[in-house]
């Protein structure tokens, strides 16, 4: 169950980040409301995850996978450019998260 909480937290964070960009500095009402609600949901599920998993694994997974998914959203939805160094860096982040979850602190 903690990994489901973590997944829900990550997805909520990515949604919140996408709508944060769409809110245009909190000048648009609906994207602003969606941003706030998404981050509330995100931190609720992140706190539930931390009840079951170590902080280092939880936070590294949340931040790393959130960054990867947010980058994908930025490229696909907002048509932002990504270069080879960014792609290599994202692959290394994924590799690091997998290693940490496989060999990190005991669960």
Curated annotation (Swiss-Prot):
Major localisation: membrane
A Pfam family this chain is assigned to: Multi_Drug_Res
Membrane topology (UniProt): Multi-pass membrane protein
Localisation: Cell membrane
Single GO MF annotation: amino-acid betaine transmembrane transporter activity
Gene Ontology cellular component terms for the protein in this record: plasma membrane
Biological-process GO terms, alphabetical: glycine betaine transport
Entry keyword set: Cell membrane, Membrane, Plasmid, Transmembrane, Transmembrane helix, Transport
InterPro entries: Small_drug/metabolite_transptr, Small_multidrug_res
TM region positions: 1-21, 26-46, 57-77, 84-104
Keyword Cell division found: no
The keyword Transmembrane belongs to this UniProt entry's keyword annotation: yes
Domain of life (superkingdom): Bacteria
Cited function: Multidrug exporter. Is implicated for the resistance to bacteriocidal quaternary ammonium compounds.
PANTHER family membership: MULTIDRUG TRANSPORTER EMRE, SMR FAMILY PROTON-DEPENDENT DRUG EFFLUX TRANSPORTER SUGE
Record family assignment: Belongs to the drug/metabolite transporter (DMT) superfamily. Small multidrug resistance (SMR) (TC 2.A.7.1) family.
Name of the protein: Quaternary ammonium compound-resistance protein QacH
Organism: Staphylococcus saprophyticus
Record lineage: Bacteria, Bacillati, Bacillota, Bacilli, Bacillales
């Amino acid at each position: 169950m903690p990994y489901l909480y973590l997944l829900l937290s990550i997805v909520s964070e990515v949604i919140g980040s996408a709508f944060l960009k769409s809110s245009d500095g909190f000048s648009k009402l609906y994207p602003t409301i969606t941003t706030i609600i998404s981050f509330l949901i995100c931190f609720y599920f992140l706190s539930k995850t931390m009840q079951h998993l170590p902080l280092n694994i939880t936070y590294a997974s949340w931040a790393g996978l959130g960054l990867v998914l947010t980058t994908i959203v930025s490229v696909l939805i907002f048509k932002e450019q990504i270069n080879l160094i960014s792609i290599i860096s994202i692959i290394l982040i994924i590799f690091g998260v997998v290693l940490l979850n496989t060999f990190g602190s005991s669960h």
